[in-house]
A protein has these predicted regions:
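Short, surface-exposed secondary-structure boundary micro-motifs
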Residues: 93-95, 159, 217
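N-terminal activation segment of mature serine protease catalytic domains
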Residues: 1-82, 90, 246-252
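Catalytic-histidine neighborhood of serine endopeptidases
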Residues: 78, 85-127, 134, 150, ...
Length: 252
């Protein structure tokens, strides 16, 4: 039901001219830094079920309203985001905004309330991060942790393939650099917690509910390539953005 409510809410924002166009938001992706007042809300170590109940209040569904060109209906794409400031300051991936298709971008909380994106505060393509401000949003923020050590337990709450608010567990497996599409290096933190399409922009957090990273992408490892076709999938590496990349975008 939340999924259908999200599309209806985005259509209402568009019809009521209550949102900034996606094309205008994309023009703001050149903003490199912004002053952000973080919501430092401490959480003592908690059981996974209590963590889930608490963190879900800070995790958002992000989505673009678009027309496929093959029918007259609107469609939505879904990604993830999370709150870091009480006045509607959120984090998601740069690539969530940078894709071409779409009229508007919006967000929805776990109770089904829809929010328009007001503006882009800061963004970095290499680190695949964007910090946005939602209009008229008073949400519960997550706090940012220090960098997590390799071997640390981590959790993810995201929306893989429209399966909203799914929680998975793993550990930090390594830190490394990758080359982006423009051949510029970006920092990454690999984890073993599962996620899939629709999880982009989701928080990676520790047992205290503090953010240690942001879901970004996956990289599949195949045993062989025959006639240009990859065969025998062995492993899927989960690449995330380390928390220090968020700190570099914000000016406290």
């Amino acid at each position: 039901k939340l999924g259908s409510d999200f599309q209806k809410g985005l259509e209402k924002l568009l019809d009521g001219n209550q949102s900034v166009s996606l094309s205008d938001l994309k023009k703001q992706l050149t903003q490199k830094h912004s002053k952000v007042v973080l919501g430092e809300i401490p959480i003592h170590s908690a059981s996974p079920n209590k963590l889930y109940d608490h963190i879900c209040k800070s995790v958002l569904v992000m989505g673009r309203l678009y027309n496929c060109g093959k029918c007259s209906k609107w469609h939505t794409s879904m990604a993830s985001a999370f709150v870091i400031g009480q006045d509607g300051i959120i984090v998601t991936n740069h690539h969530v905004l940078a894709k071409d298709e779409g009229e508007i971008l919006g967000a929805m909380d776990n109770e089904g309330t829809i929010y328009a994106v007001e503006k882009v505060l800061a963004a970095n393509q290499q680190d695949d991060l964007a910090i946005l401000k939602l209009r008229d949003a008073k949400l519960i923020p997550m706090s940012l942790a220090k960098p997590a050590n390799v071997g640390s337990d981590v959790w993810v709450i995201s929306h893989p393939n429209r399966k909203l608010y799914m929680m998975t567990k793993g550990m930090v497996s390594r830190y490394h650099m990758i080359l982006n599409n423009d051949r510029k290096p970006g920092r990454r933190m690999a984890i073993t917690a599962d996620y899939a399409k629709g999880s982009s922009g989701a928080p990676v957090f520790n047992r205290k509910g503090q953010v240690v990273g942001v879901v970004s992408s996956t990289s599949s490892i195949y045993y062989s390539v025959e006639n240009g076709k990859k065969e025998n999938l062995q492993m899927v590496v989960k690449n995330c953005i380390p928390v220090e990349s968020i700190h570099e975008l914000i000016q406290k």
